[in-house]
Amino acid sequence: MPGEFYVENKAEKVSLETVESSLAELNTKADAIKVRTDNLAGENPWQGATTADWQTVEANVVSIGAAGIRNKIHDLTLSIHNLVGTQIRVRLYKKVNGTERKVYEQSFDATSDPVGLPIINGSWAIHGVLRVTLQSNNAADNGKAVDYDYMLEKMLS
C-alpha cells in the first residue's frame, strides 16, 4: 500500500506518516530560515544630496530610519567635495530613553581631509531615527550640496 513499508525480517507494516510529518516540519523551518537569510542582503543603497546654509546654522543632511522600526546601518558616507571650510562638524543624533541626544561629533577639514567621510563603517543598530547634521565655519559653504550614501538592513523580530 502507498505510505506503508515493511521492515526487513519483520512481518508488520510500518506507517510513513511520522516521517512525512517530520519532513513537513523541516520544510517549514527551512522556509523560515530562508526568509531570514534573504534579508541579509539588505536594502538597496540609499543615496542623495542635501543643499543647505551649512555655515549659518547646523543643518540636517539626512534622517535615517523610522520611529519603532529596527534597522542596522552598515555604512554611512558623506561627501564634502563641494565645501571649503576648515572645520566641518558632523553630528549624529538619536533618541536615548525618549529624548533626542547627540551621540557622535567629529570635525573635518575640507581643505586637507579626504572628501569622502566614512561616518559609520561597520554595523550600528538603531530602533528609531538617526539624524545626521553638518555645520561649516565658512560662509562660502552656504548653498552647497553635501552628498550622502548609506546601507540599511531591516532587523526582523
Task: Place the predicted regions along the sequence by residue.
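Beta-strand-rich interaction surfaces with strong enrichment in secreted/lumenal proteins
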Residues: 63-64, 79, 106, 119-122
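Terminal beta-strand-rich extracellular "head" domains
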Residues: 87-120
